[in-house]
Structures are given as structure tokens and as C-alpha cells.
Amino acid sequence: EAKSTLQALADRGLLIGVLSNTMWPRSHHEQVFKRDDLHQLIDAAVYSSEIPVAKPHLDAFTAVLSALDLTPEEAVFVGDRPWDDVYGAQQVGMRAALIPHSRLGNQAVDIAVEPDAVLGSLGEIVGVVDRWMSEYDAARGEVST
């Protein structure tokens, strides 16, 4: 599902970025992306093993936005962790979609975290992004094609 989802987003002219809290080096992740035939669909990747902060720190999200040359309003973050992914992305001004992960439990946090979308699967992000793009274009007075 990951490849078809990323391809559908790329076909819409969207950039794909990765921001990962990890102890592994970039080479490890690149091998995984090549193994899964995803490497050609990823435009930028930022790993906490290479920067002085990790999600949910604002600078982690700013780093991936900078790597993609995007503003927060132009980006959507998809993740499975309410605190690290949703809260962190929203604090920098991005929209955030949550894919609840059964192995992570309810991930209770001390503050209210409300994702902009909750997805049952990764593939659902395509329809959500299509809707958000139409809303974004309408707010700017443009017509989506």
C-alpha cells in the first residue's frame, strides 16, 4: 500500500518527505526504501540520528520542511503517534493525519491532541489530501483540476 499511495501523491505533483525518530544511519533507511522500491518516490528525508533534535521538537519538522522547500501550510504530516507526530506537526503549523497503530496502545498524553484527520489505512490519505488541496485552492481563489 505504501508504494501505490506515495505514487498517487507524486502523480499529483506533491513532494514526499520522511521525518523519522531513529538511531539508525541514513544508509540503513535508504536500503529499506530501495528494498521496498520506494526510494524513487521520496524527495527528502530527515533522521533524528543526523540532527540535534527529534519529534515532536519544532526544529525537526522545520528541517524536513526546509529540505522540501515548503511552508507548513503547504504540508501534511502523516504518522502513528499522537504526541510525536500529530502534536509536533501541528505546533509548527502543518496539518496532521493520524493512523492509529494497534501496537502503540492509546498513547495517553498530558495535553489534548486532535488530529486533522484519522485514517484507517495509509491509502486513505490520498482522498484527504485531494479534499484539503481543493479547500486550499478555493481559499486562494484558484480552481483545482
Regions found by a protein language model. Name each.
Residues 3, 7-10, 17-145:
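Asp-based, Mg2+/Mn2+-dependent phosphohydrolase catalytic module
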